[in-house]
């Protein structure tokens, strides 16, 4: 499997975030753009070039899976995904949804929806990503108040003590070795990245990602 992320002139709109790394390393939701594509790309034998600002979605992924060598998809003059050298690609117009990060504020405006989408994709992927819901934990903290426990996903190595986890408006994802200290209040959709620490009495509101 080989995914290649290709910058276009649109990366300048993401400055200063893209001074030191590409747009594909920006985290929107739980995962970075490159993590999303690598998680979802199923054609292990095939390489794919991807616009580094492009967020994946199910329909676009399916269309990309069906592309043959030398074929590509464009929308509004912007290259989306393709196989081969761009000057030799036979392009087709993509009239479905294509979602981008164009300016730094897009990362924050799209974050809540991307948390919800990432949760679904991660659970479908299984393996190390398939975190048990709070309602399935064998050792839940009895001093933690949880609303919609089926929407709260906590890595077994994470520590949650005497907190309020409100997933009534969106999922809460707590990653590996994260710590939620006593008195913390978290209202989903929220992603707490691996090795992150939420200090005592902190309030984290929806559409937020903390760490890693």
Describe the predicted segments one by one.
Residues 1-149:
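Terminal amphipathic alpha-helical/low-complexity segments used for targeting or macromolecular assembly
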Residues 137-212:
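Structural signal for interior beta-strand "rungs" in well-ordered beta-sheet cores
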């Amino acid at each position: 499997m080989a995914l290649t992320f290709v910058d276009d002139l649109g990366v300048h709109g993401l400055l200063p975030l893209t001074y030191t790394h590409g747009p594909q390393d920006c985290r929107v939701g739980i995962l970075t753009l490159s993590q999303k594509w690598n998680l979802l790309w199923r054609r292990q034998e095939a390489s794919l070039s991807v616009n580094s600002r492009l967020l994946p979605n199910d329909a676009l992924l399916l269309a990309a899976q069906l592309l043959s060598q030398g074929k590509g998809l464009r929308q509004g003059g912007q290259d989306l995904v393709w196989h081969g050298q761009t000057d030799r690609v036979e392009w087709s117009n993509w009239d479905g949804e294509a979602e981008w990060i164009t300016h730094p504020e897009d990362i924050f405006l799209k974050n809540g929806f991307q948390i919800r989408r990432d949760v679904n994709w991660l659970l479908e992927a299984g393996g190390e990503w398939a975190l048990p819901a709070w309602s399935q934990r064998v050792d839940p903290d009895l001093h933690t108040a949880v609303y919609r426990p089926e929407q709260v996903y906590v890595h077994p190595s994470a520590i949650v003590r005497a907190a309020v986890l409100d997933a009534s408006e969106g999922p809460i994802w707590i990653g590996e070795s994260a710590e939620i200290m006593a008195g913390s209040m978290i209202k989903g959709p929220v992603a707490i990245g691996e090795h992150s620490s939420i200090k005592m009495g902190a309030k984290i509101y929806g559409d937020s990602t903390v760490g890693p």
